[in-house]
Amino acid sequence: MKKLVHALVLIGLVGVPAAAMAAEESPHSLSANVGLYSDYVFRGISQTGGEPAIQGGLDYSHSSGFYLGTWASNVGWLEDFQGYQKGNVEIDLYGGFRGDIGSTGLTFDLGAIQYIYPGTNNSGFNDADTSEVYAAIGWKWFTVKYSHYISDEVFGIGNLSGGTGDADGSDYLAISASVPVGETGLTLGASWGTFSFKNNGNYDYDDWKVSAAYDMGKLSKVMDGVTVGVAYTDTDANPAFWTEVAPNSEFLGDSTTTVWISKAF
């Protein structure tokens, strides 16, 4: 009997770590990022007038595919266009659901994002806060994303910006590729997008970008999560509508080269 009890105890002790190893991982995950950029360029348009930007974000995701996040950056265009008083920050709030489409190899992403610009808009200037819903489909290195705007004003463009009415119903379509170069840590990217502003067609434009990013963790473990990159962007935006007012007079849709360093946690 003692031998039997002893054997059962040993089996139990062996089973404890096995059971612990079999425990499921948490379905929740939290990540953060921070970066320094020589220019904040969004869809081909400089948001800082060629000046540097500090950016950071926090993201939550669930194994089901649900996600939420927030992100922030300094901006310059609100004050440079004399549209806002002390409007030098952008805060984004977003959420959605993403996952695989069966066994097709395709992925999907459905979500919404609110762009918030704290501050007071001057008389005669539209509110810059913008609401967007989006849908994307991906395959390997390629992504097609459609964004549709449901706010009356879209980044300050609307019935007070020389158009014929509100800009809700505007849209942006983008096609992009992000291709890793083997196991080198280098990733090459390219994208093309087209922005169409409802009732404000003078602001319509196409943009394109090529980029390269390198994972510094390939050089040293202490650099894990650090990425450096460079990107070239250009647009066919009309300078008459995308140039800041004097004394800056910066054409925000001009071709530009941006360098950056970021850290993911």
Language-model features: where?
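Surface-exposed loop and membrane-interface regions of Gram-negative outer-membrane beta-barrel proteins
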Residues: S46-T48, S63-D127
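Cleavable N-terminal export/targeting peptides
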Residues: M1-S29
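Outer-membrane beta-barrel "beta-signal"
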Residues: V210, Y214-M216, S249-F265
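Transmembrane beta-strands of outer-membrane beta-barrel pores
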Residues: L36-F42, H62, A72-G76, G99, ...
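Membrane-embedded beta-strand positions of outer-membrane beta-barrel proteins
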Residues: A32-V34, L58, L68-T70, G95, ...
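Short glycine/proline- and aromatic-enriched beta-strand/turn motifs that initiate or cap beta-hairpins
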Residues: A23-S61, G65-G76
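Residues that define the transmembrane beta-barrel architecture of outer-membrane proteins
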Residues: H28, G50-I54, G87-I91, L106, ...
